[in-house]
Regions:
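Short glycine-rich phosphate-binding loop at a beta-alpha junction
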Residues: 48-55, 153-155
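Conserved small/polar residues in nucleotide/adenosyl-binding loops
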Residues: 165-167
Length: 167
């Protein structure tokens, strides 16, 4: 089976894509944050865990800032955010804490109640010999703690101003 056939087969059972427009980035982020929270609530209710892949860029940053309020509003106190796992759809191989790292977007979500242990970060050069070592460690983390069958509940994708997709 070719990769294209596999993608087509897996996509057949998924809801159809839709395009929703809003007049401002703030409104887009509020809508996306609310939908993200709804999907993660459903996942945690069904399986006890929910997996979210975040992205960077200006829209990804704005969305990450809107997420803590949406998640705390969406989850009842008895649920909490302990079942949420955060991953990063694109990341840079730079030291931990570097301003260019997208994993810094997790700070507000950790403050809201997502356990730090559930933030799955790419190792930087201070912990990994090279980018291949870092990727191997993240692959092992994904195999151990990632979503069943590799299906994330929500994946945020960004499209930069130059039309480059961040996947």
């Amino acid at each position: 089976m070719s990769a294209a056939d596999l993608i087509e087969e897996r996509a057949a059972g998924l809801p159809a894509a839709s395009i929703v427009r809003r007049p401002s980035l703030d409104e887009v982020c509020a809508l996306a944050a609310g939908r993200t929270a709804d999907l993660l609530v459903e996942a945690v209710d069904a399986r006890g865990t929910g997996h979210l892949a975040l992205t960077g860029g200006s829209a990804g940053i704005a969305l990450a800032r809107a997420l803590p309020a949406a998640l705390t509003a969406g989850f009842c106190p008895s649920q909490g955010l302990e079942g949420i796992h955060l991953w990063f759809g694109d990341e840079r191989f730079v030291p931990a804490g570097h301003a260019d790292r997208n994993d810094l977007l997790a700070a507000g979500l950790v403050e809201a109640g997502v356990p730090e242990a559930n933030v799955h970060r790419l190792c930087g050069p201070e912990r990994a010999a090279d980018v291949d070592d870092a990727a191997g460690r993240l692959a092992a983390d994904l195999a151990a703690a990632g979503p069943a069958q590799g299906r994330f509940d929500v994946v945020h994708l960004g499209v930069g101003q130059i039309g480059r997709a961040h996947v």
